[in-house]
């Protein structure tokens, strides 16, 4: 019988921050090209998880869906705070 009283730790390869940045830049530019307000659309996606906020053009929707929304928010907050501290 297995012991289920211990907390297991799951390790996975984290997505490099550069990949998150590259994807966000691509999504931003795609949204601009399509005539959308990129900030509003990305915020809508992050809050709702609904990929319909991101267009399929330039594979933007597929790219952003590969990254966990928490990782995207972490990257955005980290960059914002780093910029403010300089």
UniProtKB/Swiss-Prot annotation:
It comes from the Bacteria. InterPro entries: IreB (IPR009309). Pfam families: IreB. Belongs to the UPF0297 family. This is UPF0297 protein SSP1144. It comes from Staphylococcus saprophyticus subsp. saprophyticus (strain ATCC 15305 / DSM 20229 / NCIMB 8711 / NCTC 7292 / S-41).
